[in-house]
Amino acid sequence: MIPGELLIDDGEHELNAGRATVTVVVSNTGDRPVQIGSHYHFYEVNEALAFDREAARGFRLNIAAGTAVRFEPGQERTVELVELAGERIVYGFNGKVMGKL
């Protein structure tokens, strides 16, 4: 199995169905590339990424598990985020939440 690989039957399948999403414009203001994995709490990503952080609180990239998005220096792109599921308790990352959302 390859990380992010989906082994499913034929037909259409909607990922993250019924979960809230938000779209944000992200700019890499730094001088190094920044890569963000599929399940990283987007609110807590590298400070060199400029975007509406409050809108991203409790959300992650809406991409397949095991994949990532790379932001090159000076690059601006629009990404879709999906709400975190489960108990919505966040520990670690950059230590900005350390508890329930």
From Swiss-Prot:
Query: Which reaction does this enzyme catalyse, per its entry?
Result: urea + 2 H2O + H(+) = hydrogencarbonate + 2 NH4(+)
What GO cellular-component annotations does this UniProt entry give?
Answer: urease complex
GO biological process terms, alphabetically, are: urea catabolic process
Q: What class of enzyme is it?
A: hydrolase
Under Enzyme Commission nomenclature, its number is 3.5.1.5
Instruction: Fetch the Gene3D superfamilies from UniProt.
Output: Urease, beta subunit
This protein's pathway reads:
Nitrogen metabolism; urea degradation; CO(2) and NH(3) from urea (urease route): step 1/1
- Report the main location listed first in the record: cytoplasm
Q: Which GO terms describe its molecular function?
A: urease activity
List keywords of the entry alphabetically. Answer: Cytoplasm, Hydrolase
Which CDD domains does this UniProt record tie to the protein? Urease_beta (cd00407)
* Localization: Cytoplasm
Subunit structure and binding partners: Heterotrimer of UreA (gamma), UreB (beta) and UreC (alpha) subunits. Three heterotrimers associate to form the active enzyme.
For this chain, the family text in UniProt reads: Belongs to the urease beta subunit family.
Name of this chain's protein: Urease subunit beta
**Gene behind this protein:** ureB
